[in-house]
Amino acid sequence: MDLRRMRQSVKDRLSLMEEREIIRELITRAPPRCFTCSPSYQPLRTGAPQMEMVNVQRRRTSSLPRLLGVAMSDVDSGQAVRDRRLVLDVDCGVDDALALILALSLHSTVEAVTCVAGNTTVQNVVKNVRRVLAVCGRSEIPVYRGCEQPLSQPLDLADEYHGCDGLGGVSDQFACSDDGDLEDEEDDGSVAGRPVHAAEKLIAMARTDPGQITLLLLGPLTNAALALTLDPRFGANLKEIFILGGNVEGRGNVLPGAEYNFKTDPEAANVVLTRAQCPITIVPWEAEVYSMMTRQDTAKSRFVRAITRFSLGYYDKSGSSGYEVGDALVVAAVLAPDSVASALEERRVAVELGGTHTRGQLVHAWTTDLLPDVKRTVRVVTSFNKERVSELLMRMVV
């Protein structure tokens, strides 16, 4: 399959077989020659331990960006919350559900939700997103099904944390927004009577409104990597990308040195960080905090308590009585910049594609002589204002 045919496939339905062909082509060839790629990029030789260098362009910004054209929310402090046109790409487990609820509570414009396999199967992800939207009274938001597997390795589900359904085993207590059985659905969303793949929709939305869409990648980065392969200009058409994944200190949660989202699809993380020509902010695993949400008797609070019960059982030994915020921190960083307490600016980073204990690790150039081929940079959030995050989360369930 040549690049011309790959681009043409954007106009046609991405069947599972086509998707797999593109994936195989993606990981065995050099990227197209274009200004989004690092000059030092080399084709991936599958099976050979190696590190691909990350080369990302971003504009210079302050640690806490100024609020331009802000929209005021009704949070208690009266602090400003930015309005953004958001697309959330999720592998909807418990933390993704919280992030989606938070985004909908902060008066942002959620244009669409795209689904990728990760915490649970992509079939479950579509259903879980619909459940969250129904609980929030926002079932009109379109949902698109995407990749059901990583680019080059088997999918490793997170059942032990998120439950077999991705929502702590309570999904049957909350109806989906659509009537009927979803088990046999191929995709969600349609154009001219045919299903639309999430990667196609991401490309179309960014192309229609260049510079307007903020993309939140809250699961494995497979859909975004596929979109960048189909359309090398996809990243340039986005306003910015925020990623939940990677690490700073080399601490992992699925491998000694790797975080789940990057470890699930390291090649996809590498593609996004090398080819997306737009500002990128990474919220790594170490930045996660715990926060208590007020006990309120609302539909959203009951939903949150139900889906987090399973996850909290996983953390009983820690003695924590709060919810692990996870993906919701990315939403806070996007819409409430004052929630960010500290960040590393202009970081040069690389994704480790080999390694028995470190595959998927986000490696940093801590001194100027390290990673000399990496010139472009990303912003990495390292800590949050816990009081501000707690305030946002408490308002989330009202």
Model-derived features: where do they sit?
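A glycine-rich helix N-cap at a beta->alpha junction
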Residues: 136-144
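Cysteine-centered motifs
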Residues: 34-37
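Phospho-regulated, proline-rich, acidic Ser/Thr-rich intrinsically disordered regions
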Residues: 7-10, 14
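Low-complexity, intrinsically disordered or signal/transmembrane-proximal segments
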Residues: 8, 41-42, 50, 57
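Surface-exposed loop and adjacent secondary-structure segments within mature catalytic domains
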Residues: 144-176
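Conformational coupling and interaction surfaces
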Residues: 64-84, 99-105, 109, 260-267, ...
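Active-site histidine-anchored catalytic micro-motif
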Residues: 76-131, 139, 171-290
